[in-house]
Curated annotation (Swiss-Prot):
Transmembrane segments: 63-83, 93-113, 117-137, 152-172, 206-226
Keyword Translocase recorded: yes
Described function: Part of a membrane-bound complex that couples electron transfer with translocation of ions across the membrane.
Protein family: Belongs to the NqrDE/RnfAE family.
Subunit composition and interactions: The complex is composed of six subunits: RnfA, RnfB, RnfC, RnfD, RnfE and RnfG.
Enzyme Commission code(s) on record: 7.-.-.-
Name recorded for this polypeptide: Ion-translocating oxidoreductase complex subunit E
Species: Haemophilus influenzae (strain PittEE)
Amino acid sequence: MTDLTEKNTALEEEKIESAVENQQKSIWKEIFAQGIWKNNPAVVQLLGLCPLLAVSSTATNALGLSLATMLVLTCTNTVISLFRQYIPKEIRIPIYVMIIATTVTAVQLLMNAYTYTLYQSLGIFIPLIVTNCIIIGRAEAFASKNSLLHSIWDGFSMGLGMALSLTILGALREIIGQGTIFEGIENLFGEQAKFLTHHIYHTDSSFLLFILPPGAFIGLGLLLAIKNRIDNVKK
């Protein structure tokens, strides 16, 4: 009888452990899905439109700024989650901005040192990451309320979702506007990445509509339409 009770207890414990493990896995998956698709910063929340529209004239510029933004998001989420219990609620926003500004400054110095040509190309939009609503929004909505590991994963997922949207938009505008893709990628990853540059078609003059800001609005509209169409089909 005692053996049977012990076996039943062990089985119950295994079931509980399995349920907890499955719940943890579903949390990680949901955070990732929110960042990449369900709550994508660019095509769902429509945040960070200033760099999205201004810098996405080429895939290389878009990828460079999006990687910088992803790094800042991940780092700020990490720091804010780590010290969330010590940050006074009354002055939390100024503290978040200081943390974000410090991280952006570090990223800016790194880009100035290692990717100088891209740094010059992006110009004012690197320091403007400080004012990006995505970063302060994730700090307030997620990092200040959740565990360290979940906050790191949320920052990475949201940053990756932003990076994918920005790079796709940049690639679309570059292909239609100039007939190339990843032109100047060596400025970001070095000469070994030059094989990624491709000339899709030859043109004597650029298609200015897609290179200039109106092309960014058209491209973003196409991305929004495609995403909404996919969501409607899934329903």
